Amino acid sequence: MRDPASGGDRDLVSEGAAAMRYTNPILYGDYSDPDVIRVGEDFYMISSSFTYVPGIPVLHSRDLAHWELIGYAARRLPFPQYDKPAHKRGIWAPSMRYHNGMFYVYVCMPDEGLFAFTAQDPAGEWECHYVKDVTGWIDPCPLFDDDGRVWLVHGFAASRAGINNVLYVHKMSADGLTVVDKGRMVYDGADHNDITVEGPKAYKREGKYWILCPAGSVKPGYQLALRADSIYGPYERRVVLGQGSTPINGPHQGGWVDDGHGKDWFIHFQDMDAYGRVTHLQPVDWSDGWPVMGKKGSPVLGGQIDLPPFAAEIPTSDDFQQGLGIQWQWQANPNKGWYTELKPGLRLHAAPAESLFGAGNFLSQLMQSHDFDMDVRFETHAQDGDISGIGVMGYTYYYIALGQGRVSLKMGMATEISRWTPERVTETPISEIMWPYAEITLRMRVRRGNVSFFYGDGNHSLRPLGGEYPMTCGGWTGARPGLFTLNTLGRWGGWSDVKYVKISKAE
């Protein structure tokens, strides 16, 4: 039997493995559209990243419940339009496979086409291959068949292709880096009243071809399993995971993997509004040749894994002793002029920006917990028009910043015009207070989906500014906490030195 999304056919035997309990979500970070594979005793997971760079985060685990961030497949997005923020564009729903000693990541950028990234070490540098210049393809997944053939399944974005809700299969070259035919439609959701069929993942198990894909849209959707004797179908269809009576809405896009001990699992996301798309782990059983996910087809709130616990966590705080931490992403392709690694400390140079929403040098990370405080210590060396601060990004966003002798709190709103037109952005002052000093500590507090801000000269003397405000989603993302130094007068300004970023999970 060929294991789904594994690096081999052998089962693993782990001596002394004890049952480990886990609770969903296993990750609070916005790891949207996850895919997962096993290679030997190691599990690897990737996710979407949209306009944030470096892109396609690569995570590693040995127990499926605890994950570490080990790198990114895309160091830059290879087009000049991503040298500035391109919200809702960029990296959509990648897939990951391991074949003949090589890791593969496939992704479609819906406006630019199909890419493959390859690496022998998933924590190292990845090589980018531009496979096909095409508009409107999304969510690609390869299948390296046991007879040497290579297939690709994908969906479509209606906003670009004029069609959606259907899945196509293409033949690929033996190395998986060339599409060699026009493809064939293998599933049309309209035939089964399935709307928004997307995110397909292709597998082969016991001679059968499988496509797992979500349908029904993101929040109220469900998981489909499609099964056929040929990659081209016809496919039988079954709903294998839905919300049921649980609080886990729309169990959406994800990946199927075996644990090497005879047990199958499904990792998927749940849309939690401003918190983004958090990661869940479901057991998979089998009945009449079909997968049954969760508990009788409904998501579980937690469970048991018979694997040794893996000590791992994703970093949040940073004193920049070793340079810029792995958790940070820019809002566009990074410019070397934006920052200097002081080791310790980080120098942010004031790049020109009309708004925080349009600032490529907004440096952010994913929220890793529901409630937390983020404290940042700045020493500013400002010129006219410079501001340095922290904020939480979304289509409605908030930030607190020091500039021109004042601490200011502002709200920004970005309104979509069209996919080719930059959003219309307005920023409105909420409150401000005089601050004649060059150094400041700023705090952002997140509680129950709301954010509030504080300022002062140290951790024990911080005062609130403004009230409590609801966080909102971004372009297919959750809200993102981050920091910045920018110039509002359209030119390069001075700089600020960031002494530390301390993120404390609320008890």
Description of each model-found segment:
Residues R2-E507:
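Carbohydrate-active catalytic/glycan-binding domains of CAZyme proteins
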